[in-house]
């Protein structure tokens, strides 16, 4: 599970009224720009609930979740590992991996691409198994500015909808060590 220290670091709280985890989403300067929520109800689909909800509608996201909290570690390592969802950032933080962020969807938008280019460090995409980053136009554009790598589950260690951190630290380590460069 996710450690109390990681929950506190990212200011995650439980909303008993909606049975959701709620968390602030910050811009790169640390200012809260939205509040996200993730249902804990295992029957959310059958009940017609949204898995994720946000206080304000987004339009096009202009931030990367976790960038403000993890900026120092990202710059120190010269690398940012990008997941789809915030849960993966929290789980990686629990594993002691602090150079992470989440794009909060399965594709990179132009605003996020500009943020990553401005960071100037290696970008490692660690998206869910069912996502093929080679089809993403903005990821292809990003490689003009920075070194882009990605995780590929060639040994079928993950379930179809799993994030690379969902199956434990050993699985994560194998996937990370086998990362490939986007050409």
Residue ranges and their predicted role:
Residues 103-109, 128-131, 154-155:
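Short, acidic/turn-prone active-site loops that include or flank metal/cofactor-
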Residues 1, 142-143:
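Hydrophobic, Leu/Ile/Phe/Ala-enriched alpha-helical segments that form helix-helix packing faces
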Residues 2-119, 136-137:
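Phosphate-handling DNA/RNA-contact segment within nucleic-acid enzymes
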Residues 82, 120-132:
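Acidic beta-strand-to-loop metal/phosphate-binding motif
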Residues 131-141:
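Mg2+-dependent endonuclease catalytic cores in nucleic-acid-processing enzymes, primarily RNase H-like
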Residues 100-103, 122-126, 149-150:
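Short hydrophobic alpha-helical runs that function as membrane-insertion/retention elements
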Residues 16-18, 45, 158-166:
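Short, solvent-exposed polar/charged micro-motifs at secondary-structure junctions
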Residues 75-79, 121, 140, 147-158, ...:
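A charged alpha-helical hairpin associated with nucleic-acid processing machineries
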């Amino acid at each position: 599970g996710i450690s109390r220290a990681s929950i506190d670091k990212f200011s995650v709280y439980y909303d008993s009224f909606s049975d959701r985890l709620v968390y602030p989403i910050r811009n790169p300067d640390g200012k809260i720009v939205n509040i996200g929520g993730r249902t804990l109800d295992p029957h959310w689909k059958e009940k017609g609930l949204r898995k994720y909800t946000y206080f304000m509608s987004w339009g096009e996201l202009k931030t990367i979740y976790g960038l403000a909290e993890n900026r120092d570690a990202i710059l120190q390592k010269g690398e940012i590992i990008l997941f789809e969802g915030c849960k993966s950032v929290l789980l990686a933080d629990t594993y002691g991996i602090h150079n992470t962020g989440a794009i909060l969807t399965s594709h990179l938008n132009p605003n996020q691409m500009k943020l990553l280019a401005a960071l100037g460090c290696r970008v490692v995409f660690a998206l869910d198994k069912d996502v093929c980053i080679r089809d993403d136009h903005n990821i292809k554009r990003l490689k003009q500015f920075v070194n882009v790598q990605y995780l590929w589950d060639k040994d079928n260690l993950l379930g179809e909808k799993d994030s690379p951190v969902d199956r434990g630290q050993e699985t994560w380590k194998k996937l990370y060590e086998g990362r490939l460069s986007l050409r």
